[in-house]
Swiss-Prot record:
Component of the Mediator complex, a coactivator involved in the regulated transcription of nearly all RNA polymerase II-dependent genes. Mediator functions as a bridge to convey information from gene-specific regulatory proteins to the basal RNA polymerase II transcription machinery. Mediator is recruited to promoters by direct interactions with regulatory proteins and serves as a scaffold for the assembly of a functional preinitiation complex with RNA polymerase II and the general transcription factors. InterPro entries: Mediator_Med18. It is found in: Nucleus. One of its GO terms (cellular component) is core mediator complex. It comes from the Eukaryota. Residues 89-119 are annotated as: Disordered. This is Mediator of RNA polymerase II transcription subunit 18. Its main location: nucleus. GO terms for biological process: regulation of transcription by RNA polymerase II; termination of RNA polymerase II transcription. Gene3D superfamilies: Hypothetical Protein Pfu-838710-001. Belongs to the Mediator complex subunit 18 family. GO terms for molecular function: transcription coregulator activity.
Length: 271
């Protein structure tokens, strides 16, 4: 599969206004998304990875084939992504665990209670993204992509067995809109508090949500517009997808400037 993308930087003061504009454009309320993102680095050469390890025995055949193709394709940084809710963070318990929030704001009153987060029940998926293609004539970022379901819980042992070592982790928070075949994600990266790192591996407990800090100190967000093309070799489908992104860029030009990203800034190769 191929992923075609455009990006824009959104100042913090423009965030709420853009949410409203996107809601009107897509005729839908934003779907709030909160994710743990674990970064792993390949340390084993391609072709040496055995995906039939431990808990991976529970994976279905199709998922296992997809996983094997990704992990044996080259030496890359890859991300393991797990959905969470604010209730999972210490100090913000919730009986529903529903990650959707209204557009009125993201702030919640802190609570002194502990979270109900269970690391052993945390679902995961592996997301592979290749370095964007070089020399593309179209003014969009295009790259190979794939994803596969992983076993729940502690994912470190299977990833190590597959030739990947844990590097770091962070949280992504944002809102998703869908316009026809375009997935629009207005988001920011949140970092864990300094000194809160557990032993070298993913956290088993999450800190209070209020303790997370934005990576971008100005508080700005990133607007990402993406289309997934199943057959990247079909030039007509790729052109059509690009035109759809250009159409969105035109619709939003009074608010933001959507453009392709610098190729090397999205380089996922493990050197």
């Amino acid at each position: 599969m191929h992923e075609l993308l455009l990006f824009a930087s959104v100042p913090a003061h423009q965030h709420h206004e853009l949410l409203q504009q996107l809601a009107g454009l897509t005729a839908m309320q934003p779907r709030h998304r909160l994710e743990r993102r674990l970064v792993f680095k390949a340390y084993r050469k391609p072709g040496l990875t055995n995906t039939r390890v431990g808990a991976s025995q529970d994976l279905q055949g199709v998922e296992l084939q997809r996983l094997n193709k990704m992990l044996n394709g080259g030496m890359f940084y890859t991300q393991v992504v797990g959905p969470v809710a604010k209730a999972d963070f210490g100090g913000n318990p919730s009986s529903s665990g529903d990650p959707d929030v209204s557009m009125s704001g993201l702030e919640e009153k802190p609570s002194s209670s502990s979270s109900s987060y269970s690391y052993e029940d945390q679902p995961w998926k592996l997301e592979f993204r290749d370095i964007p293609e070089a020399g593309t004539r179209s003014a969009v970022t295009a790259r190979l992509m794939a994803s596969a379901t992983l076993p729940k819980g502690d994912i470190t042992a299977p990833m190590n067995a597959w030739g990947y070592s844990f590097v770091t982790e962070y949280v992504v928070e944002g809102d998703v809109f869908v316009l026809n075949d375009i997935v629009i994600f207005l988001h920011r990266v949140l970092l864990y508090p300094t000194g809160a790192q557990e032993s070298h591996g993913p956290r088993r407990q999450l800190p209070a949500y209020q303790e997370l800090s934005p990576l971008e100190r100005t508080g700005s967000y990133v607007l990402q517009a993406a289309i997934t093309v199943q057959d990247g070799g079909n030039q007509e489908m790729m052109r059509t997808a690009s035109q759809h992104l250009f159409g969105l860029r035109e619709q939003l030009k009074s608010a933001v400037r959507l453009e392709m990203a610098d190729r090397l800034s999205l380089d996922t190769r493990a050197k």
